[in-house]
């Protein structure tokens, strides 16, 4: 992509309404534009990152054996009245009436709809286990939307729902989701710590929130410092293997890690003092097991192998897809701008032409652009007739992990400059070697399946 042909409305000044780093940088980098309080248009650069994140979520859900689908944003109130949540949910749920005066709502979550659907079509234990998920826009009428996409009123969520015959099978689904979430966040360059949490309006007996440590987090968290040394890495997991999934759960949840709602001072005090930590955290996902609470209310039963009709055991599992952009920026930035992890960057590499209009420099940049594209990468070539300092500032602001700088002086020696955004280190290489180096880095970030 040529920057001269791209829509990238960067801002030189920091908008006054932006209170935290991620909001400031997303506005300055031309990623979003506020449409109304807590509601944003996603401009091309922001939309590209959003789709990168969405793809990773899809890939890891499919790798875990979960099945994608899509449910509507507008829901009838009938099912919510059956579950008792239409009145209990509160004013954050947007209620409306259609032209026939029927109660409708803009769904903040989908437990009722998915339970009714599965109850209609799944009648035998032979159809189990089953996990369905979708990625869809939601709306919650926050009293005070703030912090950009971190606490907006409209947001993109992945919601998954498992249906199982027994509690034991449903708890395996819970563990399977925990494993897939750990892998999902690491692919995005994040360490998201699973913490015991409160179940809130969804309900349930078991729940963990996944939190990214950041000074701007809304939650106060308490944890054993040893947990920050844990990495999922590239280990292979058989998601059908109960023992393997349970072992990962034990590894990542056996140490103390809780949000303020479930914090226990006595248990925390038992941790050696040099390992006790308190911090702020950004919630980026949550998993729940809530048994037969919804299936009993909404009539989702199956016939078991003894011919008895029994309610399904269920869980609900969410990832804040749009919120993740803010969390990644909060965790990965400097005073110059964003530093995207390779897994979610909008473009894989920037190309900066130091002397636009110079025939040799122009030809070298075009050749680099073609070579990177032939390697399966998406470069962003800054071909504008601007001063070099302005081009570097733009590249630093939008945070592409790698930059290739091309100028007449280097070309005389047959080299270009490859720079890492994260470390700031530069190296002179031949153009072919620079392309090979960038391609090698991204080989570890290729799609793992066809996704959707």
Swiss-Prot record:
Q: Where are the coiled-coil regions?
A: none
Q: Where does the protein end up?
A: Cytoplasm
The primary site where this protein sits is cytoplasm
- Tell me a GO cellular component: cytosol
Molecular function (Gene Ontology), one example: proline-tRNA ligase activity
Subunit composition and interactions: Homodimer.
| NCBIfam families recorded | PRK12325.1, proS_fam_II
Q: Which family does it belong to?
A: Belongs to the class-II aminoacyl-tRNA synthetase family. ProS type 2 subfamily.
The name under which this protein is listed is: Proline--tRNA ligase
Organism expressing this protein natively: Jannaschia sp. (strain CCS1)
Q: Give the encoding gene's name.
A: proS
